[in-house]
């Protein structure tokens, strides 16, 4: 048969008052030593770690808030820059249109001035030509009248006389 020495000596369930007393005293001494020398630094280290973690969380929250603020600020600046660029493009377009209209008006005025000058010159030349023509016609009429007065001719003779005189004119000679 198998025998168990622990059970033979009284077993596990037997309470030994001396051993229990010394185990309790040892536990209390160990608890006092740990409380005196180890418990304070451990609690201090845990409190420091908790403070460090809390500061890191607070710092992360502040940095996130700052990043969100900067992002909103950047978006606002981009929007402002886009609006300014659109306004600048609009103003440039207006300036280009104004310059185009000014150049068109100036060109139109210059063309109108040239046309007016040309018309004036044409009118002057026409007036001059008409004056010269009147003078020539007057000279012709006077000359024809003087010839008619000198020679009293019939209609056919008068017509022949005028045609001969016209043929003698300088313009017809050059032709």
UniProtKB/Swiss-Prot annotation:
Its main location: membrane. This is ATP synthase subunit b. The chain crosses the membrane at residues 23-43. It comes from the Bacteria. One of its GO terms (cellular component) is plasma membrane. PANTHER family: ATP SYNTHASE SUBUNIT B, ATP SYNTHASE SUBUNIT B', CHLOROPLASTIC. One of its GO terms (molecular function) is proton-transporting ATP synthase activity, rotational mechanism. It comes from Anaeromyxobacter sp. (strain Fw109-5). NCBIfam families: ATP_synt_b. InterPro entries: ATP_synth_b/b'su_bac/chlpt, ATP_synth_F0_bsu_bac, ATP_synthase_B_chain. Pfam families: ATP-synt_B. Keywords: ATP synthesis, Cell inner membrane, Cell membrane, CF(0), Hydrogen ion transport, Ion transport, Membrane, Transmembrane, Transmembrane helix, Transport. It is a single-pass membrane protein. The gene is atpF. F-type ATPases have 2 components, F(1) - the catalytic core - and F(0) - the membrane proton channel. F(1) has five subunits: alpha(3), beta(3), gamma(1), delta(1), epsilon(1). F(0) has three main subunits: a(1), b(2) and c(10-14). The alpha and beta chains form an alternating ring which encloses part of the gamma chain. F(1) is attached to F(0) by a central stalk formed by the gamma and epsilon chains, while a peripheral stalk is formed by the delta and b chains. Belongs to the ATPase B chain family. F(1)F(0) ATP synthase produces ATP from ADP in the presence of a proton or sodium gradient. F-type ATPases consist of two structural domains, F(1) containing the extramembraneous catalytic core and F(0) containing the membrane proton channel, linked together by a central stalk and a peripheral stalk. During catalysis, ATP synthesis in the catalytic domain of F(1) is coupled via a rotary mechanism of the central stalk subunits to proton translocation. It is found in: Cell inner membrane.
């Amino acid at each position: 048969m198998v025998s168990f020495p622990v059970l033979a000596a009284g077993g596990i369930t037997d309470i030994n008052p001396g051993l229990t007393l010394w185990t309790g005293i040892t536990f209390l001494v160990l608890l006092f030593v740990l409380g005196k020398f180890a418990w304070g630094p451990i609690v201090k280290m845990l409190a420091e770690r908790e403070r460090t973690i809390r500061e890191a969380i607070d710092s992360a929250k502040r940095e996130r808030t700052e990043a969100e603020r900067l992002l909103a600020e950047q978006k606002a600046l981009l929007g402002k820059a886009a609006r300014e660029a659109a306004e600048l493009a609009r103003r440039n377009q207006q300036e280009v249109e104004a310059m185009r209209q000014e150049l068109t008006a100036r060109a139109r005025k210059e063309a109108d001035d040239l046309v007016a000058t040309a018309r004036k010159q044409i009118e002057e030349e026409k007036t001059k030509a008409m004056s010269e023509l009147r003078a020539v016609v007057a000279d012709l009429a006077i000359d024809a009248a003087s010839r008619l007065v000198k020679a009293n001719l019939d209609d056919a003779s008068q017509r022949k006389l005028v045609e001969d005189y016209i043929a003698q004119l300088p313009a017809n000679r050059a032709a």
